[in-house]
Amino acid sequence: VLAAANQPLVDVISTSFGAIGSIPVPGIEDATKVAVVDKHKLHTGAADNSPSPAIQDATAGPPWSIGIAGYAEEGDDQKEIMSGSYPDISADWTQYLPNHDDIDGYHETSGTSFATPRTAGIISYVLQNLRDEFADNGSGASEERGGMLVSGNNFTISNAQVREAINLSAWYPDFGWDPTSGTMPISPVLPCTQTGWGLVNLSNIEPI
């Protein structure tokens, strides 16, 4: 993580490891703090694949990190039971991947380790589009760029502004729970305790 933090070409760091049950083991948060607070990058951290509180997780919990839980996109759009509670935001946690033990099959696999890089990918897409639009040919948030992730023609964007846009673009789904799906219904009362700001949504970011 520190190597990525100190690499000027890196914009976003995504990590999907941590102690089982979100036991607050110290260490990684020191490195992610350097990356975000000192080097002005963004960090997405996977919540545990359990209902444990993401806020105590060393990867997903620090205030400078974006803690990611999972939801069932293209399913019932509800909260996955086996992903952390009290995250910052939630993303689709299911991927359709080739089998590892044959050459012609596919399977679905799930976890916050998929939801987290998916969120990082959305952030990267947003950054690249802004750089293209405002003629910014650089990358990273080095001191030469004033600590800005985007520094173009009369236009700058910081890591805090990108994070705010991601938060504001999120949405809460309507109640449509399938009790056989392995999810839990997102409560209309304090849904933030289950999904944080909501479900990450690229299409909502563009107008912001």
Question: Could you describe each region identified by the protein language model?
Answer:
Residues 1-62, 75-77, 102-118, 191-193:
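Substrate-binding/access-modulating region of protease and related hydrolase catalytic domains
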Residues 2, 10-14, 128-208:
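C-terminal subdomain of the subtilisin-like protease fold in secreted/lumenal serine endopeptidases
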Residues 7-13, 37-43, 62-67, 87, ...:
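Loop/turn elements at helix/coil->beta-strand transitions in domains of secreted/extracellular proteins
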Residues 17, 72, 169:
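Residues that line or immediately flank small-molecule/substrate-binding pockets and catalytic motifs
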Residues 22, 97-100, 175:
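Short acidic/His/Gly/Ser-rich catalytic and metal-binding motifs that mark active-site loops
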Residues 30-31, 54, 84, 161, ...:
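Short Gly/charged-rich anion-binding patches and loops
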Residues 46, 68-70, 80, 85, ...:
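Extracellular protease catalytic domains of secreted zymogens
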Residues 57-132, 204:
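Extracellular S/T/G-rich loop segment that most often corresponds to the catalytic His/Ser-adjacent loop
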